[in-house]
Amino acid sequence: MSLLEEVRCPRSMAMKSTNGDTIEVRRGGPGSAAEVRKWTRAMFQFAVDNELLVENPFADIRNRDKQRKRDRILTMDELRTVWRVAGCMGYPWGPYLQLIMLTGDRRGEWANAHADWLDPGCTRLEIPAAHYKTDKPQVVPLSAQAREIVSSLPGQEFGPFIFSTTGGLRPVSGFSKAKARLDKLISAETGAPLPHWVIHDLRRSMATHMERIGIAPHIIEACLGHVLKGVAGTYRHYSYLAEKTDALQRWANELLP
């Protein structure tokens, strides 16, 4: 609201954005472009719904590029290389990356984690619904290896965030720079960079290798926090906490034999 009032958009806009307007600014990032389009269109639709604008200038904008589904799976050797080198990075990025590898959480879930989301024994991270992608609370059991990392983290003096460079006032940020630093360290240690990968590929890789070692697909889905769809989502509300705990410990033992 304040943004729309500040720019003083006329209720009837003289110009509309078209697909042709997007040609010059495409730079090979269809995923990011699609997200910008989605949220910008939603913002203008809010203005239309509240009678601040007559029409949505982004209503007819389509995604010009298909978003390619990522299928990068890191091998166990690659994952162990990432783990080993991440351990040399120090706080916050070293333990942050290692916890993502052990739990399969999305990068924002540990980045925004609060200290009081950990139970007193540090056996699990309890993410409130308001902070989880599915809008449902998620309990993340911590393996023995994950508990060891969590117990070694420094306390924060000024705020709730576990991973922070501001004493807990703000969550850690700068993922791209941290990933670039990690890649550089890997190249220095091994003599060559790993084939292209992104942080989210760690989550997919964990799921793939968990299935390889015999963990049931529905337990893997529960570990990832995926919501059951259809009738199953309506009637099945068992948390699988014990099964998730066992599965994530098995995965930790596989990653760190």
Report the location of each language-model feature.
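Catalytic-site neighborhood detector that most strongly recognizes the C-terminal catalytic loop/helix
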Residues: 65, 73, 127-134, 147, ...
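Short, polar N-cap/turn motifs at the start of nucleic acid-interacting alpha helices
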Residues: 116-124, 196, 215-235, 257
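Surface-exposed helix-capping loop/turn segments at secondary-structure junctions
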Residues: 49-56, 188-193, 257
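Generic recognition of well-ordered alpha-helical segments
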Residues: 2, 38, 42, 144, ...
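Basic, Lys/Arg- and aromatic-enriched nucleic-acid-binding interface segment
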Residues: 6-39, 49-113, 121, 132-136, ...
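Short, basic (Lys/Arg/His-rich) helix/loop patches that form interaction surfaces
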Residues: 13, 80, 84-94, 103, ...
